[in-house]
Amino acid sequence: MSQEKQVFSIDLAGRQLTVETGQLAKQANGAVLVRYGDTAVLSTATASKEAKNVDFFPLTVNYEERLYAVGKIPGGFIKREGRPSEKAILASRLIDRPIRPLFADGFRNEVQVVSIVMSVDQDCSSEMAAMLGSSLALSISDIPFEGPIAGATVGRINGEFVINPTVEQQEQSDIHLVVAGTKDAINMVEAGADQVPEETMLEAIMFGHDEIKRLIAFQEEIVQAVGKEKSEVKLYEVDADLNQAVREMAEEDMHSAIQVHEKHAREDAINEVKKRVIEHYEAQEVDADILGQVNEILYKIVKEEVRRLITVEKIRPDGRKGDEIRPLASEVGILSRTHGSGLFTRGQTQALSICTLGALGDVQILDGLGVEESKRFMHHYNFPSFSVGETRPMRGPGRREIGHGALGERALEPVIPSEKDFPYTVRLVSEVLESNGSTSQASICGSTLAMMDAGVPLKAPVAGIAMGLVKTGEHYTILSDIQGMEDHLGDMDFKVAGTAQGVTALQMDIKIDGLSREILEEALQQAKVGRVHILNHMLSVIPEPRTELSAYAPKIITMTINPDKIRDVIGPSGKQINKIIEETGVKIDIEQDGTVFISSINQEMNDKAKKIIEDIVREVQVGEIYEGKVKRVEKFGAFVELFSGKDGLVHISELALERVGKVEDVVKIGDVITVKVIEIDKQGRVNLSRKVLLKEEQEKEAAKEENKQEQQ
């Protein structure tokens, strides 16, 4: 292998993608700099020399954002990047998921893959550059990675699929799909869509896979040129004699324990068998390594039997058929002071979702590498330990919780009404109260119920379902509504959310090399049947969104003003708008186009604030008549307040029909008089007249008198 800098290029969606090796981060096992347009990502892969004493594969994937990549200095006192953003966490998960299945079973060396985003071109995805870079860093290293993999973003504009759409194209696209895989199969899908049919989503996935094959061929050329020879690594294996002895002792009882239908009773039965076997070996005073192997063998016995029951006998751990959904129960409005709430229960999985409506000023402000600056719809997911009957410290959300929250948000966002139709910020919080699999999809169902209870005029209700797969050779079984054991011991977790019309979100993780088109197609169609079944249940509880908002939700009124008048409403240093807020207790949000949103729980105060703003921006027209209060008296005339913030002058000569010697002879401060606008001068000063109206009144009276005399 050469240590000199080498450069490789390929065209990707009309923009050049370049890979540089041999110059940067040479002490890592593998490192590449990927340039895609003006986006630049450094990806590295390192591994420990010795295996770790753990019972899992210790892989860590980090996608690191640097604000210098978009020419920003971090805010706050410290002025450096802190904890990863939500976008960075989601990107890390996106890269981890297609990579993880491609390490040999039993590989226990610690592996860390790091991608640092160094420059960002918004039209050239840094996530896709990082995914390709991560795959390449592993592939050219001596780490025994069974890749490469590649990813592609797919959009659809006017019925045509587009690879790696630009920011402008994404705004027009009704599909936002990220697909990853090997040259032979798909092994990761992440998608949002605007109620798109399953057949179209499948076509989009396969369209993306065609591009993946091309990118993998490109990587294979690079590996051929600069790749290191793979290290010989000893994989974790259990002792053959010990394996046979444990199986003879445990298999029969374990097979019976696994067929207990109820989750906790089944777990207790399995743990009882495990306890008996482990106590047998502890009595022989064997070392920790032997006990570790015993636990590994017991785990494999459970896994093999669960998979055999599903694929051979077509029996699921809880006794259901392959396409059967667990019992459903739903309720809305169970929290009286919240704006909306929905409780969704599916078997032993339960989620309580709460909807809170806020003013547009409550949007989430985003400060990251993307073009999006704010977000008016949010979904947050919490998974407390009591939901699985365990204890652990209560800390902030982890990667999994952030990922599940984002999946729910993506599934629901296509049906959220526009800001014009529903000028509210919407925040959903899903509290998982019980967990036995598919909690992310339960949170989607609960959130739909909560929004309907809150009176959010959804375009359509959304439900979600998690599909599973157990595959042995060419034989496979697809499972609807998987529970925890099926997720843990199966080969696939394929989450599908959508309306009756089509898909709004997909997420697929697998533990095998990949899936064929046929399996994907069957899983999507089976998911549709299950989704419609769940939707029908939800609609039996609340058929449509409530027509009225909660009494505790803010009332919002919208008005439009001349954009040139915005500064008048705000006032110097915000003095005017703060005065309105202090006087009425409302929230006021003003858009650049002159749209004003006024919100509070008190409609009377909303109306009062609106009247004040109308008076501030109101334009005085010549010929208009006002009833105003005398605010100030001078020798030359009286100043009259026409409406809030607007005065005019009635010159002494315009106060009365007769000659006035002294202003105070006609009006005093505080008097309310009727005046007419007779002139607005070049400086915007308003001249008023009382005399004109008196004269007009006098003429009307004279005309009446004349008509009366003619009739006599």
UniProtKB/Swiss-Prot annotation:
GO cellular component: cytosol
Main location as per UniProt: cytoplasm
Pfam family, any one: S1
Protein residues bound to Mg(2+): 487, 493
S1 motif domain residues: 623-691
Domain called KH: residue spans: 554-613
Entry's localization field: Cytoplasm
UniProt GO BP: mRNA catabolic process; RNA processing
EC number: 2.7.7.8
Keyword Repeat: no
Reaction it catalyzes: RNA(n+1) + phosphate = RNA(n) + a ribonucleoside 5'-diphosphate
PANTHER family: POLYRIBONUCLEOTIDE NUCLEOTIDYLTRANSFERASE, POLYRIBONUCLEOTIDE NUCLEOTIDYLTRANSFERASE 1, MITOCHONDRIAL
UniProt protein name: Polyribonucleotide nucleotidyltransferase
Source species of the chain: Bacillus cereus (strain B4264)
Gene of this entry: pnp
